[in-house]
């Protein structure tokens, strides 16, 4: 189960169908986070049928990215993901508008029907006269170039993510990760030694987190390195294979 069974994501009919299927056929369910399991159980699923095995990323794709570099006087920040209101790119723009030491790169494309939001983001940048510090780049399957460019990676979703794959990718790249404290993300950054969590939609807290990094770069280089070590240890593919194999071997 890789998505949260909530009314925000699925119709009541779809949720009921999934739950009834697991009950009728006594289906064992693997959830990609405790948050996903909680949503499954809250929707009527049987907790005993559901086991949490946290998701994973191919760490080999990120390990050759150069070490973090704070690029002189600037803090290069990357926002990566679909251009959509719930992804919270506007929150990031608002948070950095008065931080003259920040350069922001927003990578992603708008889905069909969400061009208005993309235009809104561009207008924000224009209204705040941030064209020299904020750039937009289209969606790309190769994100290594963007991760190499940045020193800080921001995940700013205003709605809970079932897991938070991009958070793990930022950690694997050895970047300082600031992420939203909701959904499955706190299961990834479960200690302040590995990254920074901020409340969803909280511009003030996000602004403070960015400023804290700028004022103590040495401290947050350590955080970035510890985050990378944790991501390799807990969220790489060999770990996932081991956990699933163990789970299958123990099924009765």
How would you describe each model-predicted region?
Residues 35, 56:
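Carbohydrate-associated surface elements
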Residues 36, 41, 105-131, 219:
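Short, structured helix-loop element that forms part of the nucleotide-activated donor/catalytic region
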Residues 75, 82-98, 116-119, 204, ...:
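A conserved mid-protein helix/loop that constitutes part of the nucleotide-sugar donor-binding site
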Residues 113-118, 131-140, 146, 196-197:
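Active-site donor-binding acidic/aromatic loop of nucleotide-activated sugar
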Residues 148-162, 175:
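Acidic donor-binding loop of glycosyltransferase active sites
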Residues 176-179, 189:
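Short hydrophobic beta-strand element within catalytic cores of glycosyltransferases
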Residues 191-192, 196-203, 212-217:
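Conserved acidic donor-binding segment of nucleotide-sugar-dependent glycosyltransferases
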Residues 205, 212, 219-234, 240-246:
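A short, well-ordered alpha-helix in the C-terminal region of glycosyltransferases
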